Amino acid sequence: MSDNSVATPAHLLQAKVIFLSFLLTGGFVATYSAFNRHLRQITSVHDIPTNVFRRKYLYGKVTSVGDGDNFLFFHTPGGVLGGWHWLRKVPTLQRKGILPRRAQKATGNALSTLSPLNLFRGLVGLRSEGGGRDQFALYRGRRKLPTLSIRLCGVDAPERAHFGNSSQPLSEEAYKWLNKTLLGRFVWVKPLSTDQYGRCVAKVEYWSWFRWKNVSIELLKQGLGVVYESKSGAEFDGQDTLYRYHESKAKKSKRGVWGLRHFETPGAYKKRINKQ
């Protein structure tokens, strides 16, 4: 038998080194690709991949509410399984009001510690900062964070006072309702488009223990918003009939803005202001 028919130990070692190098390189590339695809935090509306729009949901925390139909969203891809709360830091909100002790126990800053219950709440998307029955935020919103500006799809809330213009009736009530409902809560956001102000128009949902809730529809049920009137740029994610159904129910019940004697829709209000 010739000497070339049997591999020498040096040849075997060289082959193993080459194989392990390819294996490690391939593993690194695969891990990096998977991280970018599933666990990379999006910190700007302009950075949202085009393949996410209308197809995928983003998971994260509401850190500030601006008006009755928009808020700031801190993206936490993967939730607890993605390292958030124990490896990657989630911003906490400063306490604003003082509640009775019983209410504090029920609505405290639930994710400030790493108890199993709190990690479970973060995993399924429950509120991390509490709500309470009164319509005011228990925590102050934080704006100077790497967040996405989100505009609720399919609805228009009464306009608050901006740039010296007067506010619409029930605009503060709509703002307080959204504050109470979303501030500090983990939500699922489905990007649909971007508007002229650079905001992400999105369908927003959250889990309320028993079922998923669409924030836009809940706003319509309260009578604190109307179905978006513009013929161009309106987004409903294929549910415009459902939106109009809940608006008509609130209108028949004279809830919120529908109980006002002389109600000017937000769309009509903005047209009037722009003409001045």
Swiss-Prot record:
The keyword Membrane applies. It comes from Eremothecium gossypii (strain ATCC 10895 / CBS 109.51 / FGSC 9923 / NRRL Y-1056). The keyword Lyase does not apply. It is an enzyme of class 3 (hydrolase). The gene is LCL3. It is found in: Mitochondrion; Membrane. It is a single-pass membrane protein. Ca(2+) binds at residue 156. The chain crosses the membrane at residues 10-32. Disulfide bonds: none annotated. The active site is at 151, 159, 199. Its EC number is 3.1.-.-. It comes from the Eukaryota. PANTHER family: EBNA2 BINDING PROTEIN P100, SERINE_THREONINE-PROTEIN KINASE 31. GO terms for cellular component: membrane; mitochondrion. Residues 56-260 form the TNase-like domain. This is Probable endonuclease LCL3. The lineage of its organism: Eukaryota, Fungi, Dikarya, Ascomycota, Saccharomycotina. One of its GO terms (molecular function) is metal ion binding. SMART domains: SNc (SM00318). Keywords: Calcium, Endonuclease, Hydrolase, Membrane, Metal-binding, Mitochondrion, Nuclease, Transmembrane, Transmembrane helix. Belongs to the LCL3 family. Its main location: mitochondrion. InterPro entries: SNase_OB-fold_sf, Staphylococal_nuclease_OB-fold.
